[in-house]
Regions:
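Bacterial Sec-dependent N-terminal signal peptides
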Residues: 1-28
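Membrane-proximal, proline-rich intrinsically disordered regions
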Residues: 19-70, 249, 274-278
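Short, well-structured active-site flanking segments
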Residues: 26, 162-173
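Short linear capping/connector segments at secondary-structure termini
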Residues: 29-32, 139, 173-181
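Short, surface-exposed recognition loops and adjoining beta-strand edges that mediate ligand/DNA contacts
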Residues: 34, 61-82, 171-173, 210-225, ...
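Conserved, well-structured interaction surfaces
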Residues: 44-48, 52-58, 62, 84-165, ...
Length: 284
């Protein structure tokens, strides 16, 4: 009997001592919510992850997505072996025509946004973590700035999606991948979605993003330039497609106000002298 008691006692001792958290150490190279979101630098590092998706030149490799000129063979300025293949394939005379007789390649060359809400979820997570973990640990100005940065990138994604697909589901917060009801929710109207974008731009992005947060970093003037573009597009779409005229007017008014932020800054000109683009000593 004594033997069994000793075995049981030994098992209990091992069970209670083996879980001593003195042996637990957080991983130094894998951030978690418990160890991250402590300082403004943490917010900056997380925000840096958005740049490669939205701004050309911040990723590795190269891409022609959203480029106004995707190679000279796309235009009539250049011909290769007597043919302008990219131009003729991208602008066929009839559906399915191409200079090779195959299905026109323009049908597989779409480079705009796909039905993907990854970056919206990333922005929602950003805002939620700021609210839960950083509010009170950083200054109010810093918190408002980074929350507005997250809102800007959320607006960026929704403006793209609405421009391409029209009605899309709007997600106020993130959700678990097991929440099928949220994952497969119905689309919201484009006016509902763009009203959300309008509110974030007007009340947060154009107010709280810093006017200067360092070189090669999002600032209020960059945000205002994009806001003006998005509101101009959606305002004119609503106006000339017989949409919501009240929404059209307020979108266009915000486009004007956002453009004035850029103009009144006195920091930008309509064009940059060509020599300055390639001959600047400080790359500014």
């Amino acid at each position: 009997m004594k033997k069994y008691i000793l075995i049981i006692l030994s098992a209990v001792v091992l069970a209670t001592t083996s879980c001593d958290d003195i042996l637990d150490r957080p991983q130094l190279n894998t951030p978690t919510d418990g160890t991250f979101w402590k300082t403004e630098m943490d917010a900056r590092l997380y925000a840096n992850g958005f740049y490669r998706n939205y701004f050309v030149g911040y990723a590795d490799g190269w891409t022609t997505n959203y480029a106004p000129l995707r190679g000279y063979s796309f235009s009539d300025d250049l011909a290769s072996t007597g043919q302008q293949s990219s131009f003729s394939n991208s602008i066929p005379s009839t559906l399915g025509s191409s200079n090779t007789g195959d299905l026109a390649t323009y049908q597989t060359q779409y480079v705009g946004p796909t039905w993907n809400f990854t970056w919206i979820r990333k922005a929602n997570v950003f805002m939620e973590r700021l609210e839960a973990n950083m509010k009170g640990n950083v200054t109010e100005e810093a918190y408002n700035h980074w929350h507005a940065v997250a809102a800007f990138f959320k607006c960026f994604s929704y403006s793209r999606l609405v421009a391409v697909f029209g009605d899309v589901p709007y997600y106020e917060t993130s959700f678990a991948n097991s929440d099928l009801e949220a994952m497969y929710k119905d689309r919201d109207s484009r006016v509902f979605v763009m009203d959300k974008v309008y509110d974030m731009l007007k009340n947060e992005v154009l107010v709280n993003i810093r006017t200067n947060d360092g070189d090669n970093t999002l600032n209020r003037y960059v945000a205002a330039a994009f806001a003006s573009r998005w509101m101009l597009f959606e305002g004119t779409w609503q106006k000339y497609h017989g949409g919501d005229q009240t929404a059209a007017n307020k979108y266009l008014q915000l486009a004007k106000e956002a453009a004035e932020i850029v103009i009144n800054s006195g920091k930008y000109a309509i064009d940059t002298p060509f020599r300055d683009v390639f001959g600047s000593q400080d790359l500014k």
